Structures are given as structure tokens and as C-alpha cells.
Amino acid sequence: MTHSTGTLYIISAPSGAGKSSLVKALTDTNPDIRVSISHTTRAMRPGEVDGVNYHFVTREEFVKMGEHGDFLERAEVFGNFYGTSQSRLQQTLDEGHDLILEIDWQGAEQVRKLMPQARSIFILPPSLQALHQRLTNRGQDSDEIIDGRMREAVSEMSHYVEYDYLIINDDFAHALDDLKAIFRANQLQQKRQQVRFGKLLAELLG
């Protein structure tokens, strides 16, 4: 049994929709699925680890990487820069691993132009009230910042129509099942199975 090239999955959601929790739950039970680690200039949050959650860099370092053409995509969100290393991403796909890219709609738009074969998933909260409550429960941001994130969320959610799949994160377990189903269905595509089970297929067909 051999491996095929992995699939790139773009996953986007407004802040507070539960994207990071869903992705972590998915990869905890599916070690072959990898998550692209972006570079960012934003401050590290409590519990985050450099090189695990993000590669935390200074604005000067980020600009220098951009000048060298290191980024597949980059965007500015709430005054902070985010970017994805193209070489690291391609290496992971070539090794046969499915790879998740957690980026906003602006970054997704850039990636689709360069990698049109990528699959895209948008995650929505069940309501604006639920989204506001989740942001408040984090206990990390001021009311002013939360209000800004809510305004940004409404704008970002309008871009769901640009994505292949839509998940409503009302019940976490159900949303996780939906996410797993997307990955599983793609792994069973005929072209990927043909590569994975080439020897078996040759034997079956004589």
C-alpha cells in the first residue's frame, strides 16, 4: 500500500465559532491529519506555545520573510500579521498527509488562486448571541475588543458562500462528526484509493 499526495483543507470561521477546538479534536483522533502552523506577529495567548500554535515573530521578521517570498498567503487581522510558509506546506502534502490551513477568508482567497485543488470549509456559530457569549467566556478581551470582533464576524461570515462545505457548530459532537465526514469522504475518492491500493487492484483484476 502506497500513499497519494495529501489534500489541503482551508478552514475558516469567525473568532469564537469553535474552529480551533474542532480542529484539535479532529487531529487528536486522526494523527495523519496535520495542521499548518502559521507565522504571526500577534502576542502569545495564555497556554499557547511557540512552534505549536503559531510561529511567533516580530513585525520586522515577518516583513523580511515576505520580501523573500516565503509566504503562500498573508493577511492583516486586528492589526496583526499572519502568514503561511509555502515550502513547509508543500512538503507535508508530498509526504501524503492531509493538511489543515486555518486562515480567514482573505487568506483563503489567495490560497485558492495558487492551489485550486484545495478543499474549503467554513464554520458558523448557531447565532450571534452564542458567538458573543463564547467571546465573553474567553475572559481574554475587553468589551471594546469583543465588540470589534463581533463587527468583524458579521463581515467575515458573509463569505461562507465562497467555500465548498458549511458546518454549523451548534452541538460540538455533531459538528465534529460533520468535519470527520468531509475528510473521510475525500480519503475514499477513487483516485486516492487507486494509489493507496494499487497492488490489490492489480491482483483483483488479474
From Swiss-Prot:
A Pfam family annotated for this UniProt entry: Guanylate_kin
Cited SMART domains: GuKc
Designated name of the protein: Guanylate kinase
GO MF term set: ATP binding; guanylate kinase activity
HAMAP family in the record: Guanylate_kinase
CC annotations in GO: cytosol
InterPro entries linked: GK/Ca_channel_bsu, Guanylate_kin-like_dom, Guanylate_kinase, Guanylate_kinase_CS, P-loop_NTPase
Location (main, coarse): cytoplasm
Guanylate kinase-like domain residues: 6-184
